C-alpha cells in the first residue's frame, strides 16, 4: 500500500519522466541492488518516478526511493500471452512491498484473472491502478472500469510487425477521451519523449534507452561497425 494519497501520486508524476528500471533478464545488471541503484540514479537525474518489475526488486528499491513507484510482475504463462501482473497474488505482494501504482495488462486477450478483478484488488490494497493497453478501445474500456492511469505500453506488442516509432496517435486519442495518459513504448530518445508530451501525454516512461545497458551498447556497436562497410 502506498504511503502517499492517490492525488499526491498523480500530481507528483504529472508532466514528468518515469524511468523503467528493468535490466535485461538474467543479465549482469539483473540484481535487486543494481535495480535499486538505477532507480536512485534516475531520480537524481530528474525522473519523477520509476517503474520496477518483480517483488524482490521492489523490496530493494522502496527504502531507497521516496518518489512514486509503478510496480509490476512479469510472468511467462503457457495458457496466456498476458505477462504483466497476471495474478491477484502478484498484486497483493507488490502492494505489501510498497508499490504506489500497480500496472496490469489491459489488453483484451485471454487471461487467468479478469481485468476488472485485478482493478478491484489493486484499489482494495490502497494503490493506484494502471492499465497497459494496446488500442484506443482497450484504453477506453479500462478507463470506464475505473483505472487511474491508461498506458500506451502494449501498442505494437500484441502481434504483427513491431513498429519503429512510438504510437503517438494512441496517446493523442486517449488524452482527447479524457484519460490520464502514460506514454510508454519505444520512446528511445529525448526528442521522442518530448513529442509524447506535446501530443498530450500526462507523463512518459522510458526504459531500454536508459536502463538496459546491453541494448544501448549494441546500438552504438552496430553504428560503429556500419562505418566500416
UniProtKB/Swiss-Prot annotation:
Belongs to the NanE family. The keyword Ligase does not apply. Keywords: Carbohydrate metabolism, Isomerase. Its EC number is 5.1.3.9. Gene3D superfamilies: Aldolase class I. Pfam families: NanE. HAMAP family: ManNAc6P_epimer (MF_01235). GO terms for biological process: carbohydrate metabolic process; N-acetylmannosamine catabolic process; N-acetylneuraminate catabolic process. It comes from Haemophilus ducreyi (strain 35000HP / ATCC 700724). This is Putative N-acetylmannosamine-6-phosphate 2-epimerase.
